[in-house]
């Protein structure tokens, strides 16, 4: 006896039982240890921060990262699944700042870096318990006991080794560049981090400013263009546009495009220079404003404006101005002049760009080699310094309003507007970023770009477009990586500098630091190692560590080495098992973890860090917006699991485009649909087997061990004679082949759909068409073969699906397994494909008949002809002889499935329909041009016979104004007009028609089918076993009191009703009499325009 199965299973509760089983039996540990001595399969798990709770963004990659290791384990590999925690960086620091009421770096330093860092250490793992609970409940197996933490000394020491290796390869340097900078966090961010925080639409001022011209530099192009009589009028202004008024006090130049046309115009009593293509935008009629009249004086190329000087807007850096000779004692070629910039466009603004080399990458670049210093008069919190005395201590963005008011007062503001544009924000605190000049340590990524591209060429990406698309393009444009952060809680950059002679060294280990300083650092964090100094060998001075800590992305990118404490330990093991076989994360990590892993692996080993990568998309709320706790636009995923179970959620996520790096709009309804449409049917198939096997005393076949190599399958196949059995076993084997191929390619988008399709075939074709074989009372060979076939199918499908839906498959396995089977389905071997089980001919036959049936059902649905209503006939035409052979052979199946009385085959489709045709304008239009209309009129006059001939490959010649045109099937669009009482549908070579004429007898049989369905439903509601016999009471309801049609129908089909419902005694009552029978369970059953009232009781 099998353990009885409740068809109304509570999946969530059942999953809790499975979790207890796994824990009690140490199944996860056994899944690893049982593969000792086998080949290792290496999986890297990217470390999350434990300062926040897991969310849907973690559930998708988490499920993927469970499926592949489970599959590879079942395929015989030893798969360690070591979890890790990202412990350093801004996420932790921001959290502690809020908790301690600290608002700036100054506050932190007053509080004490040592106390601040220790507070970070104490809180960094605060949600570990919740993470473990959530990950475990999702069904994901990971090794928490052997986890790695980026704050542990061994991990941190390996990072120092990585730094020292880059140093020795000449790939580390210190530079002063324009970088994205967070004023709130007071630190630089790397370019790849911009995409993590995202760009948000913000409103900013957009102002046009007047810069009064001076005489040009004499030797410049402008000096030649504007000399003598060509000199500019004294009231000439350059018009420049900016969305960052706060950078104007630091303006040192104006940029123009060399090949852009610029105009001098006279307007409102003054002269202005701006780009010709932008004149319309500034002076044309706009809204209620009238057009502004101006006079065009001349146009010149931007190249001729180079060297034109102008008055500084503000006095702060006027000492840097160029003289007429293009020189300045303090600033080389001098500032406050027009330069050529290849970044200038005429898409917006005036075509003249204000440049502040301390606050713009392009601005900085065009001043390179001019000798003009990079002016950046702001402090660590982006407040103006004493250099900009009028705004000293004011946050730069807060100065916008005051600066604009001043410009207006001084007559320098030409136009003021507002712009909505996309602007980068900090990925941790969501503050708008500032681009500013800042000193930083860099990895010279541009030096190794070829290595990066070569590494990428060796990676199998899923989806594959990531290789040459998002990731490949990002690598092609890769820039040097700013790895230093002006923060506190992180891995200190292991570089010591001598303030006296500038000598600089990089330390690669704690032991090396001890040799150099005499101190061995037990703790490697900033507040410890900053106290360690090194005697300078060059000058005898004292070397101090540089103040910055490392970007936490550098740490996660080093995890392959640091989790092993490489090269200080596990050297041989690491080198034997690198690169990793598999990683997976979301699409955003193409600019994050995937990128940093690739940089460091290519730099250190000339290899990729991983061989295969599945990239998932973003999970959005149902309304398409980002999931937000504040908006409450999604259900807590833990609540989803409580309601539907983890398997349903996993399958919903994996059977979507999110596994193809596309976005997914999450909905509870979608998970519910997976439960109802896939998991419950799967459970019903299993429940059906168990229920009837127990009734008949059937035990698991002794030789049906189906994991790995099938046992006894060929002997069993030789005995089978029912095509349905041979077919479902063949389809099961096809499933093994398809899913194995997809998973071996890491293509989940091709692995999950075949499983979903299989459940439908098993439940709605094999079991439904085999039910009577299980129901019959005699235990003959056919019945036992049906049992063993279904057993093998259920067991093998469970093995195939186990990595995806680990809970339901474990529950089923525990009831189906024999003593020779593995303790857990996840300790079993994945099924090997057995070609001998495949029967392609039989698969073709079933697919053909299923296609015809599906088309017939579609017609029923389209025309509201419910399946329980018998129809006179299905009429079929096929132009494919093989299809016709199969359909003739499977005629009985078609009759049963479509609930028709007969199948009528026709030779030609015109026996079912009349044809009309229209011209295919797409095809004929190109050929006929102006003659098209006349051709269309002729085509519309074609008769049905002519159209039929064309469909069969003939050509019809028509004459249009003396021109002969050959009409073939591709040149016409065919419309089918059904003959009386027929509803038809066509797919390629197959046409299916339903005869919808309903006779009185067909209608009565339809009523009876509805009745049987109603009785079966009532049996379930009464909790009757499938073998229980019943007494049946029935009458017409009050809706159609004492209706003779229903009584007549029942008498006509009484034997059928009793056989189908196990009725041993039936009584026809007058309307209303059922209510007098007391405690009998009753129900109303609709039947066409009529309604039955029925009651049943168990026959004791």
Curated annotation (Swiss-Prot):
Motif, 'HIGH' region: chain positions = 48-58
A single GO molecular-function term is: aminoacyl-tRNA deacylase activity
The protein's required cofactor(s) are namely: Zn(2+)
Instruction: Choose any GO biological process term that the UniProt entry carries and state it.
Output: isoleucyl-tRNA aminoacylation
Keyword Ligase appears in the UniProt entry:
yes
What CDD domains does the record tag this protein with? Anticodon_Ia_Ile_ABEc, IleRS_core
Q: Where in the cell is it found?
A: Cytoplasm
Q: According to its UniProt record, which reaction does this protein catalyse?
A: tRNA(Ile) + L-isoleucine + ATP = L-isoleucyl-tRNA(Ile) + AMP + diphosphate
Q: Which residues bind ATP?
A: 629
Q: Which superkingdom heads the taxonomic lineage of this protein's source?
A: Bacteria
Q: What does the annotation say about its assembly with partners?
A: Monomer.
Q: Which family does it belong to?
A: Belongs to the class-I aminoacyl-tRNA synthetase family. IleS type 2 subfamily.
Q: Domain annotation text?
A: IleRS has two distinct active sites: one for aminoacylation and one for editing. The misactivated valine is translocated from the active site to the editing site, which sterically excludes the correctly activated isoleucine. The single editing site contains two valyl binding pockets, one specific for each substrate (Val-AMP or Val-tRNA(Ile)).
Write the protein's name: Isoleucine--tRNA ligase
State the organism of origin: Treponema denticola (strain ATCC 35405 / DSM 14222 / CIP 103919 / JCM 8153 / KCTC 15104)
Write the lineage as a comma-separated list. Answer: Bacteria, Pseudomonadati, Spirochaetota, Spirochaetia, Spirochaetales
């Amino acid at each position: 006896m099998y353990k009885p199965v409740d068809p109304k299973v509570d999946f969530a509760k059942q999953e809790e039982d499975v979790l207890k089983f796994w824990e009690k039996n140490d199944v996860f540990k056994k899944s690893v240890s049982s593969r000792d001595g086998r080949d290792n399969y290496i999986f890297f798990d990217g470390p999350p921060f434990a300062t926040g709770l897991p969310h849907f963004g973690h559930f998708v990659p988490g499920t993927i990262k469970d499926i592949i290791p489970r599959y590879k384990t079942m395929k015989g590999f030893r798969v360690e699944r070591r979890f890790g925690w990202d412990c350093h960086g801004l996420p932790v620091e921001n959290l502690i700042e809020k908790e301690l009421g600290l608002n700036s770096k100054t506050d932190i330093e007053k509080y004490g870096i040592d106390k601040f860092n220790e507070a970070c250490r104490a809180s960094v793992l605060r949600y570990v318990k919740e993470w473990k609970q959530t990950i475990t409940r999702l069904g994901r197996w990971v090794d928490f006991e052997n986890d790695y933490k980026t704050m542990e000394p061994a991990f941190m020491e390996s990072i120092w080794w990585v730094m020292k290796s880059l140093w020795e390869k000449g790939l580390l340097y210190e530079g002063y560049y324009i970088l994205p900078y967070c004023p709130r966090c007071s630190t630089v961010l790397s370019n790849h981090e911009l995409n993590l925080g995202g760009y948000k639409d913000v409103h900013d001022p957009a102002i046009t400013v007047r810069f009064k011209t001076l005489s040009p530099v004499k030797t410049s192009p402008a000096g030649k263009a504007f000399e003598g009589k060509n000199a500019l009028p004294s009231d000439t202004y350059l018009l420049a546009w900016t969305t960052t008024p706060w950078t104007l006090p630091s303006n040192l130049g104006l940029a123009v495009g060399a090949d852009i046309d610029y105009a001098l115009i006279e307007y409102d009593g003054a002269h202005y220079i701006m780009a010709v293509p932008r004149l319309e935008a500034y002076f044309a009629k706009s809204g209620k404003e009238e057009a502004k009249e101006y006079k065009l004086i001349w146009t010149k190329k931007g190249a001729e404006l180079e060297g034109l000087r102008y008055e500084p807007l503000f006095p702060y850096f006027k000492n840097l101005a160029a003289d007429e000779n293009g020189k300045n004692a303090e600033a080389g070629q001098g500032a406050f002049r027009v330069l050529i910039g290849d970044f200038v466009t005429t898409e917006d603004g005036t075509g003249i760009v204000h440049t502040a080399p301390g606050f713009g990458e392009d601005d900085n670049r065009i001043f390179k080699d001019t000798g003009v210093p990079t002016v950046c008069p702001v402090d660590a919190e982006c407040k103006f310094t004493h250099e900009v005395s009028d705004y000293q201590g004011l946050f730069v963005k807060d100065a916008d309003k005051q600066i604009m008011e001043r410009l207006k007062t001084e007559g320098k503001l030409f136009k003021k507007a507002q712009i909505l544009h996309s602007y980068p924000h900090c990925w941790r605190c969501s503050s708008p970023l500032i681009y500013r000049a800042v000193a930083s340590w860099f990895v010279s990524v541009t030096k190794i770009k070829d290595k990066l591209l070569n590494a990428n060429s060796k990676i199998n990406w899923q989806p594959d477009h990531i290789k040459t698309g998002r990731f490949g393009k990002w690598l092609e444009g890769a820039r040097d990586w700013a790895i230093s952060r002006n923060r506190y809680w992180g891995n200190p950059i292991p570089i010591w500098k001598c303030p006296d002679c500038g000598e600089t060294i990089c330390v690669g280990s704690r032991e090396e630091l001890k040799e150099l300083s005499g101190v061995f650092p037990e703790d490697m964090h900033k507040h410890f190692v900053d106290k360690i100094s090194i005697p300078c060998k060059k000058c005898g001075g004292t070397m101090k560590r540089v103040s910055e800590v490392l970007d936490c992305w550098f740490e996660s990118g080093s995890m392959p080495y640091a989790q092993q404490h490489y090269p200080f330990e596990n050297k041989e093991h690491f080198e034997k098992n690198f690169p990793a076989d598999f990683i997976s994360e979301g699409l955003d990590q193409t600019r994050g973890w995937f990128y940093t892993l690739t940089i460091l692996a290519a730099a250190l080993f000339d290899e990729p860090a991983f061989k295969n990568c599945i990239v998932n998309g973003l999970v959005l709320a149902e309304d398409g917006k980002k999931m937000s706790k504040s908006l409450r636009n999604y259900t807590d995923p833990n609540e989803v699991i409580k309601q539907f179970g983890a398997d349903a959620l996993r399958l919903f996520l994996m059977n979507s485009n999110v596994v193809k790096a596309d976005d997914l709009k999450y909905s509870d309804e979608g998970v519910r649909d997976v439960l109802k449409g896939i998991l419950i049917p799967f459970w019903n198939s299993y429940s059906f087997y168990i229920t009837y096997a127990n009734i008949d005393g059937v035990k698991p076949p002794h030789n049906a061990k189906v994991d790995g190599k099938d046992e006894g399958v060929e002997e069993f196949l030789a005995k089978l004679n029912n095509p349905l059995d041979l077919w479902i076993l063949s389809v099961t084997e096809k499933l093994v082949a398809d899913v194995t191929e997809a998973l071996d390619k890491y293509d989940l988008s091709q692995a999950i759909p075949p499983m979903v399709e299989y459940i439908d075939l098993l439940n709605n074709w094999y079991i439904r068409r085999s039910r009577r074989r299980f129901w019959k009372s005699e235990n003959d060979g056919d019945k036992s073969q049906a049992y063993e076939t279904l057993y093998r199918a259920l067991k093998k499908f469970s093995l195939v699906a186990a990595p995806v839906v680990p809970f339901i498959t474990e529950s089923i396995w525990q009831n189906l397994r024999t003593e020779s089977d593995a303790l857990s389905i996840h300790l079993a071997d994945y099924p090997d494909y057995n070609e001998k089980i495949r029967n392609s001919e039989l698969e073709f036959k079933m697919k053909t008949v299923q296609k015809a049936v599906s088309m017939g059902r579609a017609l029923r649905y389209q025309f509201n002809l419910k399946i329980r209503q018998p129809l006179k006939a299905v009429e079929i035409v096929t132009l494919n002889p093989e299809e016709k052979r199969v359909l003739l052979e499977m005629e009985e199946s078609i009759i049963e499935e479509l609930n028709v009385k007969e199948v009528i085959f026709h030779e030609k489709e015109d026996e079912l329909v009349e044809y009309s045709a229209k011209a295919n304008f797409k095809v004929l239009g190109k050929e006929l041009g102006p003659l098209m209309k006349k051709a269309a009129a002729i085509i519309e006059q074609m008769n049905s016979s002519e159209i039929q001939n064309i469909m069969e490959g003939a050509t019809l010649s028509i004459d249009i104004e003396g021109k002969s045109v050959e009409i073939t099937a591709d040149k016409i669009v065919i419309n089918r007009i059904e003959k009386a009482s027929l509803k038809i549908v066509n797919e390629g070579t197959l046409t299916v028609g339903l005869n919808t004429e309903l006779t009185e007898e067909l209608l009565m049989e339809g009523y009876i089918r509805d009745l049987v369905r109603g009785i079966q439903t009532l049996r379930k509601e009464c909790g009757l076993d499938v073998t229980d016999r019943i007494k049946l009471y029935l009458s017409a309801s009050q809706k159609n009191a004492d209706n003779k049609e229903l009584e007549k129908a029942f008498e006509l089909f009484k034997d059928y009703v009793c056989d189908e419902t196990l009725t041993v005694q039936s009584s026809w009552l007058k309307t209303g009499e059922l209510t007098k029978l007391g405690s009998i369970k009753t129900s109303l059953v609709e039947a066409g325009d009529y309604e039955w009232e029925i009651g049943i009781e168990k026959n004791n």
